[in-house]
Amino acid sequence: MSDEVTYATLMLQDSARVRGNQDGNNLRKEGHPAQSSLWRGAALSLMTLCLVLVTGLVTLATMFLQVSNDINSDSEKLSQLQKSIHPQQDNLSESLNSSRKSLTEESLQSQISALLERQEQMATKLCKEFLIHASDHKCNPCPKTWQWYGNSCYYFSINEEKSWSDSRKDCIDKNATLVKIDSTEERDLLQSQLSLTFSFFWLGLSWNSSGRNWLWEDGSFPPPTLFSDKELASFNGSRDCAYFERGNIYASRCSAEIPWICEKTASLVKTEDLD
């Protein structure tokens, strides 16, 4: 009896063990699909991430190539620009140096001219002082028997009288012209000499029949500021030459014989003649 009980017990235990093993196997078989799905999801995510990374790398590589090409193109343009700028810079430098040199030369020339002018003024002033005490001083810029006033030398024909044409010829022989009055100062100066020498004299002014006007020997017109319109209107075609008297000009026959005055530019006063 006890043997039967023991056998029955063993059979029940074996049966229970078999069922337990079957249940465990069934549980393992049921759990495998869940793990496989999880791995597939992870793999898909990794593949997607790799695809995104590859796409990003390709995009970055494309952008890098584009930027590299742009840099190379800009470098070539910069190089060409530098090549074109260098000659311009050289030309600009040469022009600047030339301008500086020109300005320096002009400045020096201006200073030299100013110094020479100042020297001439001082020499002229000293010479006039010397001539007050010695009329024949060697610094005199005018020939002997000539009078020096301003920038001109004057020759007064004190003891001679000639026609206008002969007077003009005499002045030409002296490398001068019949006097031309350019300013009120010169007019007043000549007027002051009349009381000392003579009362009237020929002018280098004559009637131009073709132009129907009065002209100085250099072809210029007598200024209306020196002689009134009334005085100019007093001229007529029968009297073709002009003379000066008491501060005015008058017309006369050119054949009339009266004194005359020659005029020419005074020479520069030499500093070595001031000794």
UniProtKB/Swiss-Prot annotation:
Domain C-type lectin: start-end pairs: 149-263
An MF annotation (GO) of this entry: signaling receptor regulator activity
Location of the motif ITIM motif: 5-10
Glycosylated residues, chain numbering: N91, N175, N236
A Pfam cross-reference name: Ly49
Localization of this protein: Cell membrane
Transmembrane segments: 42-64
In-chain residues carrying the UniProt-annotated modification Phosphotyrosine: Y7
Signal sequence interval, chain numbering: none
InterPro entries (alphabetical): C-type_lectin-like (IPR001304), C-type_lectin-like/link_sf (IPR016186), CLEC12A/B (IPR042916), CTDL_fold (IPR016187), Ly49_N (IPR013600), NKR-like_CTLD (IPR033992)
Annotated GO biological process: melanocyte proliferation; negative regulation of receptor signaling pathway via STAT
Function: Inhibitory receptor postulated to negatively regulate immune and non-immune functions. Upon phosphorylation, recruits SH2 domain-containing PTPN6 and PTPN11 phosphatases to its ITIM motif and antagonizes activation signals. Although it inhibits KLRK1/NKG2D-mediated signaling, it does not bind known ligands of KLRK1/NKG2D and therefore is not its inhibitory counterpart. May limit activation of myeloid cell subsets in response to infection or tissue inflammation. May protect target cells against natural killer cell-mediated lysis.
Comment, domains: Contains 1 copy of a cytoplasmic motif that is referred to as the immunoreceptor tyrosine-based inhibitor motif (ITIM). This motif is involved in modulation of cellular responses. The phosphorylated ITIM motif can bind the SH2 domain of several SH2-containing phosphatases.
Protein name: C-type lectin domain family 12 member B
Organism: Mus musculus
